[in-house]
Amino acid sequence: MSILRAKTSGAQQHEEFRMAFKLSYITGRQDNNVLEVTLAAGQNAVVHATVKNTGTEALNLLKYGTLFDSAPVQKVDVYEGENAVPFKGILRSIQRTDLAPEVFHTLAAGETFETTFNAAEVHDLSSTNYTFIAEGTIPVAPVGSTKISDTIFFKSNTLTIPVDGAAAQSMAKAIPASIDRRTILQSGCSTTQKTQTTQALSYCAQLARAASTAASSGSATKFSEYFKTTAAATRSVVAARLSAVASQCSSLTSGSTTYYCTDIYNYCSSNVLAYTIPSTNEIVNCPLYYSALPTLSGTCHAQDRATTSLHEFTHAPATYSPGTADNGYGYSAAVALTSAKAVLNADSYALYANAIYVGC
């Protein structure tokens, strides 16, 4: 169940790891193996990342949720032993059409992009050795266009860094632990926002319930299309997560997640529909959620408010733990994931729920 709300008013420098794996086009272009990503250690939890276009053509890469993104997104996965360290930044739902030019980064042939970030800003780190790896997908459009035409899968080298916990914990977090939560939806959101959000969450609950049932006892072929396995254990996890989403979408006044209809953290930039703060279990709708999406779509794999909300609820660990990540945006990227990645990919759930509803 969810509460809907609105806002009122020095370790040693380490040797660089040069070995890297190259990124490859999922859809099998002739010019695959065109990007090379390398992680290197800085002071304490600081990571230097380089992305090099080793191909012969420029690449027009979507920034959101990648190493090109300036926001506190999940740029690397962090592990303590075999256990993933929870991410405490933001996860955003992105409009897949009518994208703005500024949400892309063009990387010329032979060009290298460099970025440096402190993993302690979005992870709680103690004094131990941590493993860092950058892995995921990047949507790509033709140069001069903003229409997504392909997806790139990437995996960097593995980097191990001994972290000074006291120094890491003194680092200011990108997202504060809590914020003032004074105004609930009914007294803060506009009438139109309240109506549209209420309708969307009602459909979200219906779609999640139907998809949960399908995951448990529906077509194995359809399930495998989105989650790349028919294993009973995986079907059970997917069904349970979707059932939990249905519960969250079923209430506007109570529960373990908090839902806002205004941009309380100021991350509603171009083409962002909504975002989730996993560490605080807060979900925020952006203006585009209301202006660019229908409440519910009857088109296969199209975006709407209901499935966007469903997508966001899977991110929140209070809905079902662990929360999902953004391992692949859109149908082509989502169905190219491994089963292990798909079961933790928010869009896989939204796309599957849409497919069960529409009959894709």
UniProtKB/Swiss-Prot annotation:
PROSITE patterns: ZINC_PROTEASE (PS00142). Keywords: Cleavage on pair of basic residues, Disulfide bond, Glycoprotein, Hydrolase, Metal-binding, Metalloprotease, Protease, Secreted, Signal, Zinc, Zymogen. Its EC number is 3.4.24.39. One of its GO terms (cellular component) is extracellular region. One of its GO terms (biological process) is proteolysis. The active site is at E312. Glycans are attached at N129. Zn(2+) binds at H311, H315, D326. This is Neutral protease 2 homolog SS1G_13741. Its cofactor is Zn(2+). It comes from Sclerotinia sclerotiorum (strain ATCC 18683 / 1980 / Ss-1). It comes from the Eukaryota. Belongs to the peptidase M35 family. It catalyses: Preferential cleavage of bonds with hydrophobic residues in P1'. Also 3-Asn-|-Gln-4 and 8-Gly-|-Ser-9 bonds in insulin B chain. InterPro entries: Fungal_M35_metalloproteases (IPR050414), MetalloPept_cat_dom_sf (IPR024079), Peptidase_M35 (IPR001384). One of its GO terms (molecular function) is metal ion binding. Its main location: secreted. It is an enzyme of class 3 (hydrolase). Secreted metalloproteinase that allows assimilation of proteinaceous substrates. Shows high activities on basic nuclear substrates such as histone and protamine. Binds 1 zinc ion per subunit.
